[in-house]
């Protein structure tokens, strides 16, 4: 079986390599390693993410951490929440641009500093291997919608009045990016937005989530030409 602890995160095929039992133990090990009492966590649009998130948070709460769940978000929204609300720890359930059968966990300490193979992940792995399987019990977390605050933060870097009317094509790849885009660009009515694949769907039915692959950009490229858009 492949090792799930990588150089920069935890990642594997679900459920063969990464499952809910392992996510629970990782949650406990993470809090035990950092020795903190608060955590913010989010998850992406993959089909396995909600269940892995619940299991991970069951582990963090079992270690006594007050846990805030911001739900389905992009990784940038989790990073924003960790820094803006001064949490001492954060976690994102995501496999980034990997194929649908994968999932993973990004672990971060305060000031949005990620744990890696050179800083923290080996210690979390050592603790993880000592923790027994998950017991049954209620999940006690606090839910929070952070999209409005995230949008205000993003827009604080620009002068909205200086934005010229444009036609823009956006492809969210059926991930969580469409949610943060809608929250932000709702405040820029001078832009005409053409939305592609904005409905979160962990099957990634239209193309894969990795935008570096040319075949995953063909749809947006064609739409930019079709709409006569300024950019995409």
For every predicted segment, state its role:
Residues 11-14, 44, 73, 106, ...:
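Gly/Ser/Thr-rich beta-alpha loop segments that engage phosphate groups in nucleotides
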Residues 8, 96, 170:
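Single, functionally critical "micro-switch" positions that shape active/binding sites
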Residues 39-103, 184-232:
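N-terminal small/polar loop signature for handling phosphorylated ligands or for N-terminal nucleophile
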Residues 103-227:
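Gly/Ser/Thr-enriched, mixed-charge loops and adjacent short helices
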Residues 19, 74, 115-119:
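General structural signal for secondary-structure boundaries
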Residues 1-58, 62-64, 143-167:
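An N-terminal, well-structured beta->alpha segment
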Residues 21, 25, 73, 123-126:
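Short alpha-helical interface patches
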